[in-house]
Regions:
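Catalytic machinery of carbohydrate-active enzymes
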Residues: 1-222
Length: 222
């Protein structure tokens, strides 16, 4: 038996776990998240979108401003600003996605918006949500499970990060998955839950996220 040293630099989480297996002779360079959806789930997603007024040719955007961890919740007013921009400037049809007990996050954003998003699509099950995300053109959201599903669905994503390292949770390589984070100087010595200001997420500049969103759209959609 021998101890395996753990790399201390920031590494994509999946790569980090694969690195632990290398001393055992297990190697892999395939880090792609894969989650197939059935024809039944695809039909469900298509009918759901049709029922709420989805229009072919319109930019389809999923937005997930939710998280059960306070250090992952970007302010509602910032999501509202970008949501309004997507609707007004890009003609987007915007869908808020959330899980059980997270409706209040959505309502907080809607109250700050000047435009109406698409009607609520409810809370589909996991595979139905994966199929729904596959119908989207792009995903914007906090660092949460829905972003991982969007990545598995193969659509471009933009994640907003607080306490966790963006490098650890954003697939390396292809530029269709991007992230924005802010370090107020204490991310490496975080004292959460003693931390009260949570500036690592609350102070992520909305202008930087806006620019990153524009770049992602220009590079992969428009």
């Amino acid at each position: 038996h021998r101890a395996i040293g753990l790399p201390m630099d920031s590494t994509y989480s999946a790569q980090h776990k694969m690195n632990l297996l290398e001393p055992l002779g297990v190697e892999s360079s395939d880090l792609d998240l894969e989650m197939e959806s059935s024809e039944e789930d695809q039909d469900y997603a298509e009918k759901l979108l049709k029922s709420v007024g989805s229009q072919a040719g319109k930019l389809q955007v999923s937005v997930s401003p939710v998280s059960r961890q306070p250090y992952k919740v970007w302010p509602a007013q910032h999501f509202a600003k970008l949501s309004d921009w997507l609707i007004e400037s890009q003609g987007a049809q915007l869908y808020f996605l959330y899980g059980p007990g997270e409706e209040h996050f959505i309502e907080s954003v809607k109250k700050e918006m000047n435009n109406d998003p698409m009607p609520d699509v409810g809370i589909p099950d996991l595979l139905q949500t994966r199929a729904l995300l596959g119908k989207m053109d792009i995903h914007l959201g906090n660092d949460n499970g829905l972003r991982h599903l969007a990545i598995a669905a193969g659509i471009p994503t933009l994640g907003i990060f607080g306490k966790p390292s963006a490098v650890s949770w954003t697939p390396p390589g292809p530029t269709q998955h991007r992230s924005v984070e802010y370090d107020p100087g204490c991310k490496q010595s975080c004292t959460y839950p003693e931390c009260e200001h949570l500036s690592c997420i609350r102070d992520v500049p909305v202008d930087e996220v806006h620019q990153a969103l524009k770049n992602l759209l220009n590079d992969h959609i428009l």
